Amino acid sequence: MTAANQNYGTGRRKSSSARVFIKPGNGNITINQRSLDVYFGRETSRMVVRQPLELVELLDKLDLYITVKGGGISGQAGAIRHGITRALMEYDETLRPALRAAGFVTRDARRVERKKVGLHKARRRPQYSKR
């Protein structure tokens, strides 16, 4: 892939990190050398990945080459969406207000809360016995 006429965006969500390259094409989405439908079995994950492209109506005008690592399926889909959004803003800055209004520009900063000593999980307490 040549560096000319392509745009790049990095996306992160939970512990996942995605690198997204977009260039003019006919709508092919390649994730880790696999197609979108092969990589994500769940339709909800595929929908999350397509959201920014459908919003700006560029789904069938751009090819996407994506590498993603870390985390689970949901986190990876969110990281890819964030990366696509950043790459689209680099591609055309006039798309920023629409993407911002949809909430795609802001990085979701929620992380897994750590487990505390004396608790079963982050907030799950042992059962309380009155007597």
Curated annotation (Swiss-Prot):
GO biological process: translation
InterPro entries: Ribosomal_Su5_D2-typ_SF (IPR020568), Ribosomal_uS9 (IPR000754), Ribosomal_uS9_bac/plastid (IPR023035), Ribosomal_uS9_CS (IPR020574), Ribsml_uS5_D2-typ_fold_subgr (IPR014721)
Gene Ontology MF terms: RNA binding; structural constituent of ribosome
UniProt keywords, alphabetically: Ribonucleoprotein, Ribosomal protein
One GO location term (cellular component): cytosolic small ribosomal subunit
rRNA-binding among keywords: no
Name of a matching Pfam family: Ribosomal_S9
Family (UniProt): Belongs to the universal ribosomal protein uS9 family.
Protein name in UniProt: Small ribosomal subunit protein uS9
Provenance organism: Actinobacillus pleuropneumoniae serotype 3 (strain JL03)
Gene name as annotated: rpsI
